[in-house]
Every structure is written in structure tokens, then in C-alpha cells.
Amino acid sequence: MLDDITTQLKSRRALFELIARDMPPLMADMAAQLVEAFRKGNKLLVMGNGGSAADAQHLAAEIVGRFKMERRALPAISLSTDSSILTALGNDYGFDAVFRRQVEALAQAGDVVLGISTSGNSPNVRSALQLARERGCRTMGLLGRDGGSIRSLCDLALVVPSLDTPTIQEGHITIIHIVCDLVEKALFA
């Protein structure tokens, strides 16, 4: 059991060393684009499925509430959290449309629409990002593996290069926390 723990921790360390080496410019770009959008009065729409839905909800909560510093609220909406909307849209339009329909209702040009997908291939995230691009939104992805089919729909894609879903999710939440910190410092420090 202890060997398994050590192996898993070494694997995580290697991934975080890779993130530390390759992703700081991408995280800085993500934060800068969010800061610009918030300064212009735009909002963040964020979505994902399963654990990525939890990450989307977590990110929206940090942006609307606060991350580390007391400050004014910023506009962010998780498209993964309203069970009535999700089940109505899933029932009436199919699960592939649950995020797209919300983007249709809520997104305006200049908004940031962020899709979180450990596979990079979630059809409902892909469909929503496609519509967001057509509407003049900035599209971003927090993705895993090789970025999948969603990568090409993103103006900015941060890809955690692992095949292990829990490890990808750990990378995503770390990136989310760093970006939240950068956004707060840029807008309120």
C-alpha cells in the first residue's frame, strides 16, 4: 500500500513539474483575458461534466465570491449547476445541447466561455464552444490528454497531458486556483 502511495505521489510530482515548466505563460494569458473581459463588463460562462462540472462550479464560486482577498463580486456563471435547466434541456433537446442552449441564452460578444473536459471530447462542451465562437466570445478550454476535438475550438487551451482522469482534474483545479489568484491581484491589489 505504501509503495502505491509513493508511486502515485511521484507521478503527480512529475505532472506538476511539467505544468510548472510549460504552462505559466498560458495561465498568465488566461488570467489576462479574464481581467480584460471583466474590465469591459463581460462575464465568464464555464461548464463541464462530472468532476469537471464540480470544477466549473468551484471556479464560478471563486470568481463571484472571492478567492483570497475581500473585493467586489465578478460575473461568472457555471452552466453545470442548475438541475432544472439541465434536465429540461436534456429532456427536450438532448444532453448534447444542455450547455449550447444556455450559451444561446446568456453569452454575448466579449464574454469568456470556458469548457472543462478531461477527455477533450465532451460533445456538449464542444457544441457550446462552437456556438460561443460564432457569437464572438473568447473560447477557452481546460482539457486533458491531447486536448481532443475541443482544442481546435479554443482561442486558448490549457491541456494537462495525462491519460489519468483524477490526475488531470488535480492539474485543472491547481490551474484554476492560480488563475483566480492572478485575476484578483490584477484587478484589486
Curated annotation (Swiss-Prot):
Its main location: cytoplasm. One of its GO terms (biological process) is D-glycero-D-manno-heptose 7-phosphate biosynthetic process. Substrate binds at N49, G50, G51, E62, N91, D92, S117, T118, S119, S122, Q169. It is an enzyme of class 5 (isomerase). The keyword Membrane does not apply. Gene3D superfamilies: Glucose-6-phosphate isomerase like protein, domain 1. SUPFAM superfamilies: SIS domain. Binds 1 zinc ion per subunit. One of its GO terms (cellular component) is cytoplasm. Its EC number is 5.3.1.28. Pfam families: SIS_2. Zn(2+) binds at H58, E62, Q169, H177. It comes from the Bacteria. Keywords: Carbohydrate metabolism, Cytoplasm, Isomerase, Metal-binding, Zinc. It catalyses: 2 D-sedoheptulose 7-phosphate = D-glycero-alpha-D-manno-heptose 7-phosphate + D-glycero-beta-D-manno-heptose 7-phosphate. Pathway: Carbohydrate biosynthesis; D-glycero-D-manno-heptose 7-phosphate biosynthesis; D-glycero-alpha-D-manno-heptose 7-phosphate and D-glycero-beta-D-manno-heptose 7-phosphate from sedoheptulose 7-phosphate: step 1/1. Homotetramer. NCBIfam families: gmhA. This is Phosphoheptose isomerase. The gene is gmhA.
